[in-house]
Amino acid sequence: MGEGNIVTQVLLPLSLAFIMFALGLALVVADFKRVVTAPRAFLVGAFGQMAMFPVAGFVLASLWPMDPALKVGVMILASCPTGATSNLLTHFAKGDTALAISLTAVVSIASVFTLPFVVGASVVHFMDAGTRPDISVAQTMIGVFLVTNVPVALGMAVRRWAPETALGMERVARHVAAVLFVFIVLGAVYSVREDIRDYFAQVGLAMLTLNVAVMALAWLLGRASGLARPQRIAVIIECGLQNGTLAIFVALTLLGSTAMMVPGGIYSLVMFATAGLFLALVLKTRAGV
C-alpha cells in the first residue's frame, strides 16, 4: 500500500472516526428526545441543513462556472451534516446549545441515508458518462455509516455505562479531534498545492458565497418561523458550519477524487472565518439577529 493510500484508506477514516467518537462522548439519549419536546425549532434547523443547504449548493454548482468534478464536490459538502465544533461556537454565541447538539446528532445519523443518494445523483447530473467515478450508493452508505454512526454509538455507550470516564475522555478527545480536523483540512489543501491557485480561482469565492448565503437564509428561516434569539443563533451556526472532514473522506476515500475534495477543504477554511465574524456580531449586538 502506497503512502497516498495509507493516508486516504487508513489515516483519514480513522481520524474521522475518532472525531465522531469524541462527538458521541458528549451525547445522551435526551439529546434525541428534543425532536419531540421542541419540534418546531428542531424541524426548522433540520430543514435548513438537510433541504435548504443542498438546494443552495445545487443552485450555486449549476450557475457557477467550474469543473464538473468540483460541482460534485460542492454537492458532497452540501449533503454533509454540520461539524461538531458548531456546538461549541453556539455555546460561545449564547445560542441554544441543547438544540445545536440535537441537530448535530440527528442530522449526522440521517446523513448516512441522504448523502449517498445526493452524491450519486450529482455525479450523474454534472459529469459525463466517460468521466464519472464508479460509485455505489450502498457501498457509500456503508462507508459513511462505519466512520460516523458506529463511532458515535460507541462514544454514547461509554457515556452511558461509564459517565465519569466519558467526561474525562471528552475533554482530551475534544482537543485531539480539533487538532485532527485542522491537520486533515490543511493536509487536503497541501495535497493540491500545485493546482491550488486554479482551484481557489474556481471555487474560493463560490464557497464564501455559499457560506454567507446559507447563513443569511438560515437567519431568514429562523425569523420567519418565530424562533427565539438563542434558537436562531443555533440554527444559523448549525447551517453555516459543515462537516468538512466527512466531505473530504467521501471525496478522497470513497470516490478517489482529489478535485471533489477541494470544495470541502476550502469551505472548511472559509466557514470558521465567517463564524468568527458572526460570533463577534452576536456578542456585540445583544438584541436582534
Where are these regions (language model features)?
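Alpha-helical transmembrane segments of multi-pass small-molecule/ion transporters
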Residues: 1-289
